[in-house]
């Protein structure tokens, strides 16, 4: 039976979470060579590589399994410290590393978890990923939980439907007047600038496809949820924006719908480790109770 040295596993987790050996060393209060040595010792112990040494480093299949183990051990240790307070020498708040999409972070997330974090003295380490790809962080064992658009959980985890984020195709009045003086035509949307969050953002593609428009389209790239709204309101392009995020802009007429009533509802799921302990289970209950206040209720 292998008994792991958790200092070695902590080094692996730090390298992956911090995106490199130098930052991992700073986070752990060690030299970079010491972190590298711990990774080498871990690889010698398990008999195979645990990291692919690229920029940034990422875990091998075995490395992902070890990171999954680390995440669950951290959560279970937190449970034990609550039952045996003397084990928690520093009395420091617990930290949860969570992956979620930028639009959730910009809209409903803070209201949904604020009370929980204050009452339970929890610090969040948030990793922003598009809702289409956030689950890769769970699969890699980098996070304790994840909000994403996929219903299927990774091995060892569960998923629960939180609700749906409602998106509307919007643009500024000036943009519409400039490009569509006789009214918005679906077929012409591909020929005017759109705004896309990043290469994994397929909402604009889906919007056009729902309208029967196939093929590519010209677009700006803007990897910021708040910046996306500002660019849209500034007349640089059209885009799919969370309805909840722009209620003020819609009320003031700074943004208008391209095609009124044409919406896309994106289901969002909460993924969490089955053996994640009481803290993660409590957060899950809290999210199920509160997330619906900021999302559209859907069956599922």
Swiss-Prot record:
Residues 4-60 form the HTH lysR-type domain. Belongs to the LysR transcriptional regulatory family. This is HTH-type transcriptional regulator ArgP. The gene is argP. It comes from Pseudomonas aeruginosa (strain ATCC 15692 / DSM 22644 / CIP 104116 / JCM 14847 / LMG 12228 / 1C / PRS 101 / PAO1). Pfam families: HTH_1, LysR_substrate. It comes from the Bacteria. Residues 21-40 bind DNA. GO terms for molecular function: DNA-binding transcription factor activity; sequence-specific DNA binding. Homodimer. InterPro entries: ArgP, ArgP_gammaproteobact, LTTR, LysR_subst-bd, Tscrpt_reg_HTH_LysR, WH-like_DNA-bd_sf, WH_DNA-bd_sf. NCBIfam families: argP (TIGR03298), PRK03635.1 (NF002964), PRK13348.1 (NF009888).
